[in-house]
């Protein structure tokens, strides 16, 4: 993760920092983030990084958003200390973050998904592998024995065909 205000603001706006989801403000969804980024770009503020340090009334005035939305954005952007602790734990475990504006972000995701591409990715390992042709398999972790055999057969075929297998939530 590059240490820029733009990246930091993106991570603050999108991250769920507590396990029990009991936060003062709910992080932005992907769709909300894209809309909000466009609002910011169309304003005099220009970029998400320039929002850091703004108070609620400045957010309202500069972006033309309702007080409730300004409060939510303000609350999300002011979790810097908490986020620093969370990021430190991630980095210790070899987990990193890349955001859509960074050079390392997989271009294929943007090409294929457009504004449905996740603005932020958590990853471990070599992110450059995501530039290769591949197949993502997620959620295959809690299956019966027959399902596991089926998935193993599928995985074997994927690998023999020369595709990179990207997993998430699988065993």
Regions inferred by a protein language model and the residue ranges of each:
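Structural motif
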Residues: 166-169
């Amino acid at each position: 993760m590059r240490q820029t205000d733009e990246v930091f603001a993106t991570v603050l706006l999108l991250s769920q920092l507590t396990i029990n989801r009991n936060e003062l403000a709910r992080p932005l969804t992907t769709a909300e983030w894209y809309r909000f980024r466009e609002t910011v770009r169309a304003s005099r503020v220009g970029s998400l990084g320039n929002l850091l340090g703004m108070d609620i009334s400045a957010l309202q005035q500069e972006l033309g958003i309702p007080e409730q939305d300004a409060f939510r954005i303000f609350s999300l952007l002011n979790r810097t200390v908490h986020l620093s602790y969370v990021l430190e734990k991630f980095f210790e475990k070899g987990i990193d973050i890349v955001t859509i504006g960074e050079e390392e972000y997989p271009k294929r995701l943007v090409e294929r998904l457009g504004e449905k591409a996740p603005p932020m990715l958590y990853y471990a390992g070599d992110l450059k592998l995501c530039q290769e042709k591949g197949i993502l398999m997620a959620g295959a972790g809690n299956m019966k024995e027959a399902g596991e055999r089926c998935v193993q057969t599928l995985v074997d075929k994927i690998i023999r065909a020369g595709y990179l297998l990207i997993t998430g939530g699988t065993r």
